[in-house]
UniProtKB/Swiss-Prot annotation:
Record EC number: 6.3.2.6
Protein family membership: Belongs to the SAICAR synthetase family.
CDD domains: SAICAR_synt_Sc
Pathway named in the protein's UniProt entry: Purine metabolism; IMP biosynthesis via de novo pathway; 5-amino-1-(5-phospho-D-ribosyl)imidazole-4-carboxamide from 5-amino-1-(5-phospho-D-ribosyl)imidazole-4-carboxylate: step 1/2
The protein, known as: Phosphoribosylaminoimidazole-succinocarboxamide synthase
A GO CC annotation given for this chain: cytoplasm
Source organism: Aeromonas salmonicida (strain A449)
GO biological process: 'de novo' IMP biosynthetic process
Classification lineage: Bacteria, Pseudomonadati, Pseudomonadota, Gammaproteobacteria, Aeromonadales
GO molecular function, one term: phosphoribosylaminoimidazolesuccinocarboxamide synthase activity
NCBIfam families linked: PRK13960.1 (NF010567), purC_vibrio (TIGR02735)
Length: 367
């Protein structure tokens, strides 16, 4: 079986019973279950949700995105072998640890297959909750160009690239385009301050002002849980993005939860500790791939300048990447996943067929 056969690149065409359009994101696709199937599974599986709660299947792919584009390899290798399973395994590990530490629940109710989560529909907080422990990446580029204020926080003069910050900084941005919020630009992924969020807490989908404190606590405590665990593996947790939302439990109580993914190579920067002590940055996340792209193409501004998106999309579409590059990414993702979970990653020889069989035979979601 070829490498391409082991990759799940298209994940929005599964014959799962649904009465709504499939939502296809950059990496995951979401299938909303029918009310009948949701109610049946809640009863059969004993999920801690209201009897009429809407459920969904979240199916991950092996696609690789960077700079808002999907990148593909030569010879039909349209994803990274092992990437989807690695991301799900890492997130599931951290979500479980958060719950054990008494932080908060996640949206995951069940894991039928390494590529599949059954999730409870959540009302999302419209914030990309970003926490930073080092000045690097986009923050460093802006700082180098003279910016000193980030999300209402003023940084001191004299910081160096990749320097550890005195404390964890929370630098949130908008999740999607928010309209009608005074002082908040109507654009996706723009930085916002704590004052912006307090002033428009309902516009950001918070139930009450006190939940702003709660999300910041969950962000910092979750960051520290992951950072401590990675430190024991001699890995450095540099920065990350969390997402939050609201769900109800079986008794009808609303709770703020972690959602999407946490602490993965897609949503975080992770550095190798031994290399850092030697003065080198060795990425154990997607950042290594981003840097490869910036170094590979003669005009990296195309990848950084949001005013050149048509050129960027054309660049990604017109350049199939070498197999060795795709396999380097695979080794990074699978390697850090196995470090984190402490055992070999469960890999699929034919993920699509496996998913169909388990959802048909064990969950009754495919006719």
């Amino acid at each position: 079986m070829s490498l391409a056969d082991q990759v799940l690149a298209v994940n929005d065409d599964l014959p799962i019973r649904t009465d709504k359009p499939v939502h296809s994101g950059k990496v995951r696709s979401v299938y909303w279950l029918t009310p009948e199937d949701s109610a049946r599974l809640i009863k059969e599986k004993g999920y801690d949700v209201p009897a009429d709660a809407p459920l969904a299947l979240m199916v991950i792919s092996d696609r690789i995105s960077a700079f808002d584009c999907i990148w593909q390899g030569v010879d039909g290798l349209n994803g990274v072998p092992g990437k989807g399973a690695a991301l799900n395994a890492i997130s599931s590990h951290w979500f479980k640890l958060f719950k054990e530490k008494g932080l908060a629940d996640s949206h995951i109710l069940d894991i039928p297959h390494p590529f599949v989560w059954i999730v409870q529909k959540a009302r999302p907080v419209m914030i990309e909750a970003i926490a930073r422990q080092y000045i690097t990446g986009s923050m460093w580029r802006a700082y180098k160009d003279g910016e000193r204020e980030f999300c209402g926080i003023t940084l001191p003069e004299g910081l160096k690239k990749d320097q550890k910050l005195p404390e964890i900084l929370i630098t949130p941005s908008t999740k999607g385009v928010l309209t009608g919020l005074d002082g908040v630009p109507e654009a996706d992924d723009v930085n916002v301050s704590r004052a912006d969020i307090e002033r428009h807490y309902q516009g950001f989908n918070f139930s009450k002002p006190a939940d702003i404190d709660r999300y910041e606590v969950l962000l910092k405590e979750g960051f520290n849980v992951i950072s401590d665990a990675l430190a024991s593996l001699d890995q450095i947790f540099v920065d990350t993005k969390f997402e939050f939302g609201y769900v109800q439990d079986a008794a009808g109580n609303e709770k703020l939860i972690y959602m999407d993914e946490v602490g993965t190579p897609d949503s975080s920067r992770i550095w190798d500790g031994a290399a850092l002590r030697d003065g080198q940055i060795v990425e154990k996340s997607k950042e290594g791939f981003r840097q490869w792209l910036l170094n590979h193409f003669p005009d990296p501004d195309i990848l950084l300048n949001k005013n050149r998106m048509p050129e960027r999309f054309a660049l990604a579409k017109g350049n199939k990447l070498p197999t060795e590059v795709m396999m380097d990414i695979s080794n990074t993702y699978v390697g850090i996943a196995e470090k984190i979970i402490g055992h070999p990653l469960v890999r699929s020889a034919n993920p699509k067929q496996e998913i169909i069989e388990v959802l048909r035979d064990q969950y009754g979601l495919i006719d």
